[in-house]
C-alpha cells in the first residue's frame, strides 16, 4: 500500500536553469557555453533513451536572462525544447514565500518555488550557494557552471 521508494524511481527528473545557465546556452562566446551545452546534451540523450528527464527555466529567470523565444538570437536554445515554468498563482505564492524567508532575487525565488514543486531536481547554476538557500533544506543536485 502506498508508494514505496522503488515506485518513485520512475518519476521524472527536472534540470532547472538559472540566469547564467540560460545565457551560457544561448551565447557560443560565453565562457561557460561548452559546459552548459554538455549538460543540456546529457538531458537530450536521456530523453532519446526514454528516460524521464526535462529541462526547464522559471519564467522569472527567463525574463532576467532576456530570453525572448521569438528572437533569432535564441534559435539554438529554442531547439533544446526547454520548458517554461509559468509564474502562475501557485508558483507566485510559493516564490513570494521563498523570497520573504530568504531575501533572494525574484528569479531565484521562482527557482526555489520550482525546486519545491519537483521531485528530483538538478540545478545548473553559477551560484550554488544561492540554490542551496532557495532549496530550503530540500535535497537537490547542484551543478556549478
What is each model feature region?
Residues 61, 81-102:
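Acidic catalytic patch
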Residues 21, 61, 91, 110-111, ...:
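Alpha-helix capping/helix-boundary segments
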Residues 1-12, 117-145:
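Acidic, PIN/NYN-like endoribonuclease modules and their adjacent C-terminal/linker elements
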Residues 105-122:
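Acidic, metal-associated active-site segment
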Residues 1-55, 66-79:
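Short, well-structured N-terminal submotif of metal-dependent ribonuclease cores
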Residues 24-29, 62-63, 99-103:
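Short, flexible loop segments at the rims of nucleotide/cofactor-binding pockets, characterized by
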Residues 57, 86, 106, 125-126:
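Short beta-strand scaffold positions
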Residues 50-55, 81-83, 117-122:
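Short active-site oxyanion
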